[in-house]
């Protein structure tokens, strides 16, 4: 029977992967290439297409795993460039994680001995949610973070039920994967650790493992948390040391000119605490419907007052609270996708809730299904008609990037072209000879920006000043160049937001 269930899990995961990847390819060929996702592909592209070839070209700001997994596609793109320029590689990675999340959820129902009918229905309601489908196909990291979160919560609830240390090891490995995808893994780990400590303090089974006297309970909690979180702590320390050894700044990923903190100058104010709360709720409420149904199911089955409810609140809403604080402090843009995690994390607690309900498990499953269905309907409507929920559809690669690449390919071949890849990443990916260009990861980039004439630069590509264009290295070094020019540079083309200059010799 167990073998048959595993086959079903793999079959469902394979189907999800193939559907998501096919949908991602469709999106790419129809121009839906989201900027953040394509930037991850670009980071991998630089490794094999910018001299000298090395992994540091991937950059130190964004977590490396999504880019690292695309390196085989980047290598193959030397013969067929659409593998990277049409989103085939990035959709492969997001589809892979979407399948992982679905498999983890489906297997969790089996671990909790839930009815197969309920397991399949609830897993499909999660997998077919429009938000899950879109982010499983578009190469963004939200589905990757969500899948790792489902794996973590699955093992958390299985550990709470059985106490087996095997699940702690699995949680630790999943946290490593999560950290290599997004930095939100750190606050999420804190919320999970608090939930684990609460469980060990209250659970009668856990109390059997330590004497209830002196500091023994604290030592037991500490040792359990070390077992769980040491892998991700080690990974985070390695990442800090990696930044330090290369840049001299251990927190380069947090405070450099390309980091998220550099964006904060462009984030709007939301009018204090109440304004921030209103802003967040207007975006997060459809994501909360599965969790609201989960709480209702626990109330209907008389399990709401158990301590596990507090653990669920910490795990599902912790990142939402963290993001709200960041928005209030002006450190987050508050996009809908930054608030989507309850949609991924709440379903992971459904198997435990159905199991804990005992004879009322059918009722808990039905209520949970209604919450998942309601969320799917609202988000499906939002993608069609709501400007709020359609905002993520509009954040594509910079317009005219391909036209700039076409111009450079046709008119500037053989010349030394200088550009900051911050806004020109998609132009670089469409270049015929990107190895000849000087971009942000090139060893001589800073010298060329400081003195293009002395360093033999032939052409410059400069984005329009204003908003994110102000973060471009050339605009920072030469603030008059875009609008007024410089005596050593002649404008030869203007394409969309970009201007191309020839350096006078």
Where are these regions (language model features)?
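Short acidic/glycine- and proline-prone juxtamembrane loop motifs at membrane-interface regions
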Residues: 59-62, 131-144
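Membrane-embedded, lumen/periplasm-facing catalytic core of multi-pass transferases
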Residues: 367-425, 442, 446
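Short helix- or helix-capping micro-motifs
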Residues: 16-17, 119-127, 154, 175-179
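Hydrophobic, aromatic-rich transmembrane alpha-helices
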Residues: 282-309, 350
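Membrane-lumen/periplasm interface segments of specific transmembrane helices
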Residues: 191, 198, 202-206, 219-294
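Hydrophobic/aromatic-rich transmembrane helices and adjacent perimembrane loops
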Residues: 136, 142, 187, 331-362
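Signature aromatic-anchored transmembrane alpha helix within multi-pass, membrane-resident enzymes
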Residues: 14, 117, 229, 233, ...
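Transmembrane-helix motifs of polytopic, lipid-linked glycan transferases
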Residues: 89-113, 151-155
């Amino acid at each position: 029977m167990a073998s048959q269930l595993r086959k079903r899990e793999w079959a469902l995961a394979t189907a999800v992967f193939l559907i998501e990847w096919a949908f991602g390819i469709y999106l790419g060929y129809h121009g839906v290439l989201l900027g953040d996702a394509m930037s991850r592909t670009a980071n991998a592209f630089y490794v094999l297409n910018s001299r000298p070839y090395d992994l540091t070209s991937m950059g130190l700001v964004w977590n490396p795993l999504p880019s690292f997994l695309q390196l085989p596609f980047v290598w193959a793109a030397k013969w067929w460039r659409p593998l990277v320029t049409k989103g085939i590689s990035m959709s492969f990675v997001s589809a892979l994680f979407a399948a992982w999340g679905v498999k983890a959820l489906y297997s969790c129902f089996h671990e909790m001995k839930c009815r197969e009918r309920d397991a399949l229905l609830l897993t499909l309601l999660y997998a077919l949610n429009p938000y899950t489908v879109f982010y499983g196909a578009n190469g963004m990291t939200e589905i990757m973070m969500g899948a790792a979160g489902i794996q973590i919560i699955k093992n958390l609830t299985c550990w709470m039920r059985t106490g087996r240390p095997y699940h702690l090891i699995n949680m630790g490995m999943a946290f490593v994967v999560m950290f290599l995808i997004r930095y939100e893994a750190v606050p999420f780990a804190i919320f999970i650790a608090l939930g684990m400590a609460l469980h060990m303090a209250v659970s009668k089974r856990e109390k059997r493992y330590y004497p209830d006297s002196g500091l023994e309970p604290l030592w037991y909690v500490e040792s359990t948390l070390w077992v769980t979180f040491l892998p991700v702590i080690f990974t985070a320390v390695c990442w800090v040391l990696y930044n330090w050894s290369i840049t001299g700044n251990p927190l380069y990923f947090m405070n450099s000119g390309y980091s998220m903190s550099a964006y904060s100058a462009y984030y709007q104010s939301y009018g204090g605490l109440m304004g921030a709360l209103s802003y967040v709720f207007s975006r997060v409420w459809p994501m909360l419907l599965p969790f609201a149904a989960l709480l209702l199911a626990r109330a209907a089955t008389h399990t709401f007052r158990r301590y596990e409810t507090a653990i669920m609140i910490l795990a599902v809403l912790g990142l939402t609270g963290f993001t709200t604080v960041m928005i209030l402090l002006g450190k987050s843009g508050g996009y809908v996708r930054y608030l989507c995690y309850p949609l991924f994390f709440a379903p992971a607690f459904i198997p435990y809730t159905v199991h804990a309900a005992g004879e009322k498990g059918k009722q808990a499953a039905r209520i949970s299904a209604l919450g998942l269905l309601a969320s799917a309907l609202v988000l499906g409507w939002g993608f069609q008609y709501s400007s709020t929920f359609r905002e993520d559809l509009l954040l594509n690669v910079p317009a005219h990037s391909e036209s700039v690449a076409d111009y450079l390919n046709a008119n500037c071949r053989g010349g030394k072209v200088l550009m900051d890849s911050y806004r020109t990443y998609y132009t670089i990916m469409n270049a015929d000879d990107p190895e000849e260009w000087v971009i942000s990861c090139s060893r001589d980039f800073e010298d060329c920006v400081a003195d293009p004439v002395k360093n033999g630069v032939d052409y410059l590509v400069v984005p329009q000043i204003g908003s994110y264009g102000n973060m471009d290295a050339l605009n920072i070094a030469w603030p008059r160049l875009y609008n007024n020019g410089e005596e050593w540079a002649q404008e030869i083309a203007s394409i969309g937001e970009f201007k191309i200059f020839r350096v006078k010799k």
